[in-house]
């Protein structure tokens, strides 16, 4: 029996892989309407179900794009993703709150970084407002600041709800999913690729492959001979502030340091009304290392951002591991990597924050890249 050959295989069922599958399901719907053959697709993951890692273990923030370095894929895809994520939530009835983000300095040297943030906002076409005492008191009464930047397009949703909604739609449309399946080898042949799964127990044949394996994307890339990227596992932990839902209305962020630390430890009013503080940035020695920080750092950061937090209010929440492309101490701000090698094998590497927000735009970008090849099917 000739083995089934798929038009497309997606490695990784985190938010980016799922979003590509969902967008493909929409393309297939249109193809059916005009009596064209559907694009066959399989999504493969080593875990037992979807979004087991960073995709469900993040702040759930719908970012505006103000933090991203201008003229990068990250900036472009985050700004576009912001608009698309709200549209998606509306289309699939996913709850969200578009409450804006207040970014405030917490030391004198932050003033220079405030002007850098303004510059980025203008360059990335993100609407913002410089706010002072009275306006801050209206937006976030407990914020400790006399000046800040307010970005109205930022919001919050539940990242797992988004992942599950797009997964359900993709599944409904006939896209196949294969869990508990780790890709351990890749053979290229004239019609595409053979993916070897779980110690040779299974194989999957596909014409085009997308590597969206998150933390393990560099290892999948190495199987194709693309060796120039290394993913550094960077833990982000969150504490929950109990019993004081009034402290934060939406999102309160520090002014970022524009380096390996990311956007900084921030306060998020989650959809259930609880407040999270995090994430920190702890570089791990391996991708499966278990680590837990002390509460001190979180209490200290919360106290710098708002009045009225006491140490007793904090309880440990959850953690996730980012797929970072720079090591600890780096001053670089790496861009998302979307690279094709060899032909028809596309790698998505270092898709960390704002990867969740950017995911619908990343999916569109990829499918545009493949549009001509998929139309031929």
Task: Identify the role of each PLM range.
Residues 2-16:
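Beta1/beta-strand and adjacent pyrophosphate-binding region of the FAD-binding site
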Residues 3-5, 68, 95-105, 130-133, ...:
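Helix-loop-beta segment of a Rossmann-like dinucleotide-binding subdomain
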Residues 9-11, 204-216, 363:
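Short hydrophobic core segments
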Residues 25-56:
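Glycine-rich FAD pyrophosphate-binding loop
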Residues 60-135, 264-265:
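Dinucleotide-binding Rossmann-like beta1-alpha1 core, especially the glycine-rich loop
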Residues 70-80, 104-113, 149-168, 290-293, ...:
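Short beta-strand to alpha-helix junction loop
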Residues 94-96, 212-343:
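Active-site substrate-recognition segment that forms the wall
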Residues 149-207, 360, 369:
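Helical element adjacent to the flavin cofactor pocket in flavoenzyme catalytic cores
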């Amino acid at each position: 029996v000739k083995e089934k050959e798929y038009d497309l295989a997606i490695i990784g069922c985190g938010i980016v892989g799922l979003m590509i599958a969902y967008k493909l399901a929409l393309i297939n719907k249109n193809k059916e309407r005009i009596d064209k053959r559907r694009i066959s697709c399989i999504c493969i993951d080593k875990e037992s179900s979807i979004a087991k890692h960073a995709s469900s273990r993040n702040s759930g923030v719908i970012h505006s794009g103000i933090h991203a370095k201008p003229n990068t894929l990250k900036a472009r895809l985050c700004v576009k993703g912001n608009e698309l994520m709200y549209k998606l939530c509306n289309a699939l009835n996913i709850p969200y709150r578009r409450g804006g983000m207040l970014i405030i300095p917490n030391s004198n040297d932050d003033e220079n970084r405030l002007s850098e943030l303004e510059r980025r906002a203008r360059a990335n076409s993100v609407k913002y407002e410089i706010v002072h005492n009275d306006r801050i008191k209206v937006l976030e009464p407990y914020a400790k600041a006399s000046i800040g930047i307010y970005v109205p397009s930022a919001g919050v949703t539940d990242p797992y709800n988004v992942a599950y909604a797009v997964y359900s739609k993709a599944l409904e449309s006939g896209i196949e999913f294969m869990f508990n399946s780790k890709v351990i080898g890749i053979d290229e042949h004239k019609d595409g690729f053979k993916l070897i799964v779980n110690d040779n127990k299974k194989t999957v044949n596909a014409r085009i492959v997308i590597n969206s394996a998150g933390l393990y994307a560099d290892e999948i890339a190495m199987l194709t001979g693309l060796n120039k990227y290394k993913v550094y596992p960077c833990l982000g932990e969150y504490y929950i502030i109990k019993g004081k839902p009034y402290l934060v209305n939406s999102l309160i962020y520090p002014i970022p340091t524009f380096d390996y630390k990311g956007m900084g430890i921030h306060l998020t009013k989650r959809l259930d009304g609880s407040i999270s503080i995090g994430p920190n940035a702890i570089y791990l020695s391996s991708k499966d290392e278990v680590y837990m920080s002390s509460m001190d750092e979180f209490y200290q950061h919360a106290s710098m951002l708002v009045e009225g937090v006491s140490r007793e209010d904090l309880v440990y929440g959850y953690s996730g591991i980012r797929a970072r492309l720079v090591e600890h101490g780096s001053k670089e701000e790496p861009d998302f990597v979307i690279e094709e090698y060899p032909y028809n094998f596309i790698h998505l590497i270092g898709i960390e924050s704002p990867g969740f927000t950017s995911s619908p735009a990343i999916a569109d970008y990829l499918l545009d890249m493949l549009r001509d090849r998929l139309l031929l099917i």
